Amino acid sequence: MGQFTLTPSEQEIQAFLKQYKKYLSSSKNPYIRYFFRLEQATASVYTSGKLLLQGEEADKYALFFKETADLTRPPQKITYQAMIGTDEVGNGSYFGGLAVVASFVTKEQEDFLRKLGVGDSKTLTDQKIRQLAPILKEKITHQALLLSPKKYNQVIASGYNAVSVKVALHNQAIYLLLEKGIKPDQIVIDAFTSSTNYQRYVKQERNQVSQAIHLEEKAEGKYLAVAVSSIIARDLFLENLEILSQELGYQLPSGAGAKSDQVASQILKAYGMAGLETSAKLHFKNTQKAKQLLER
C-alpha cells in the first residue's frame, strides 16, 4: 500500500477539494479537516495543514500535488533526434487486460505522424484509433505488451499492486525495444506514479533499463512517441475487450462504472467467479458490487 505525507498550500487543497468533491466523506477524527474516500485510496487533510494519502492508487493522487510530491521533472526543454515514449491503456477499466506500448519515433517521422492525425488517444474516437493503429504498427518501431485479465489477477495475487505491475510492464516494453538495437536520445513515460516509486519498484525487475527515464504528466499530448504508444495501446485494449466479449457472450464495457457492475453480475450468474477471473480485474470494487447486485 502506498503512503505519502505532503504539505500542500491552501490553494492546492482547495483545488483538490474542487476536483474530488464527490469523494468527500466524514471522519470522527477532530484533527481531520477534510476526508476523501477515493478510488483505491484515501486522503486526509489535517488541521495542521498536512495531507496523508494512503492506498494502492495513492501515487496517482500524489501527482496532483507535483510541487510537493517530489515527482521527477524533465528538463525545461527536452531536445532530441529520436525518442522512446510509452503509455498504457486499460488500468482504469474493470474489464479487459492492461496494454503497454513503447514506441521509437525520430524527428524525420514527425511530419508524417502529424499529417496522419496522430494525437492523444483520449481525444480520438475508437473508430479513428482502429484506423490509425494498423498504419502505426507497420511504420513505427514499437514493442506492445498485453497482460490478460487472467494473468493480471495472477500477478496481483503474487504480490504486485496496481502501480508495480505497470512499472514492470513499462520497463519490459522499453527493455525489449532497446534490445532491437535502437538508440534513443530520450525515454519518456506518461507519468502514472512518482519517480521515487518507479525506481523502487523497477529494482525488483530482472531486466532493468540503464538509460535515464523521464516521467512526465500528460506526455501523450506533448510527444508524438508517447501519442503513438497511446493509440496502439488503446487499439490493443479494444481488441482484447472485443475477444473477451465474444467468448462470454456479453458486451463488456470499458471503464469501471455502474454498467460494469451490471454486466459483471450477469457474468457471475452465468459462469460464477471463473467468468470474471478471465475477463476482469478482480481487485476493483466492481467485483463486490456485482456480488451485491446478484444477491438482491
From Swiss-Prot:
<feature type="binding site">
    <location>
        <position position="88"/>
    </location>
    <ligand>
        <name>a divalent metal cation</name>
    </ligand>
</feature>
<dbReference type="GO" id="GO:0005737">
    <property type="term" value="C:cytoplasm"/>
</dbReference>
<keyword id="KW-0963">Cytoplasm</keyword>
<dbReference type="InterPro" id="IPR024568">
    <property type="entry name" value="RNase_HIII_N"/>
</dbReference>
<dbReference type="InterPro" id="IPR036397">
    <property type="entry name" value="RNaseH_sf"/>
</dbReference>
<dbReference type="InterPro" id="IPR001352">
    <property type="entry name" value="RNase_HII/HIII"/>
</dbReference>
<dbReference type="GO" id="GO:0032299">
    <property type="term" value="C:ribonuclease H2 complex"/>
</dbReference>
<comment type="function">
    <text>Endonuclease that specifically degrades the RNA of RNA-DNA hybrids.</text>
</comment>
<dbReference type="InterPro" id="IPR024567">
    <property type="entry name" value="RNase_HII/HIII_dom"/>
</dbReference>
<keyword id="KW-0255">Endonuclease</keyword>
<feature type="binding site">
    <location>
        <position position="87"/>
    </location>
    <ligand>
        <name>a divalent metal cation</name>
    </ligand>
</feature>
<keyword id="KW-0479">Metal-binding</keyword>
<feature type="binding site">
    <location>
        <position position="190"/>
    </location>
    <ligand>
        <name>a divalent metal cation</name>
    </ligand>
</feature>
<dbReference type="Pfam" id="PF01351">
    <property type="entry name" value="RNase_HII"/>
</dbReference>
<feature type="domain" description="RNase H type-2">
    <location>
        <begin position="81"/>
        <end position="296"/>
    </location>
</feature>
<dbReference type="GO" id="GO:0006298">
    <property type="term" value="P:mismatch repair"/>
</dbReference>
<dbReference type="Pfam" id="PF11858">
    <property type="entry name" value="DUF3378"/>
</dbReference>
<dbReference type="GO" id="GO:0003723">
    <property type="term" value="F:RNA binding"/>
</dbReference>
<dbReference type="GO" id="GO:0043137">
    <property type="term" value="P:DNA replication, removal of RNA primer"/>
</dbReference>
<dbReference type="GO" id="GO:0000287">
    <property type="term" value="F:magnesium ion binding"/>
</dbReference>
<comment type="similarity">
    <text>Belongs to the RNase HII family. RnhC subfamily.</text>
</comment>
<keyword id="KW-0378">Hydrolase</keyword>
<keyword id="KW-0460">Magnesium</keyword>
<keyword id="KW-0540">Nuclease</keyword>
<dbReference type="InterPro" id="IPR004641">
    <property type="entry name" value="RNase_HIII"/>
</dbReference>
<dbReference type="InterPro" id="IPR012295">
    <property type="entry name" value="TBP_dom_sf"/>
</dbReference>
<protein>
    <recommendedName>
        <fullName>Ribonuclease HIII</fullName>
        <ecNumber>3.1.26.4</ecNumber>
    </recommendedName>
</protein>
<dbReference type="GO" id="GO:0004523">
    <property type="term" value="F:RNA-DNA hybrid ribonuclease activity"/>
</dbReference>
<dbReference type="InterPro" id="IPR012337">
    <property type="entry name" value="RNaseH-like_sf"/>
</dbReference>
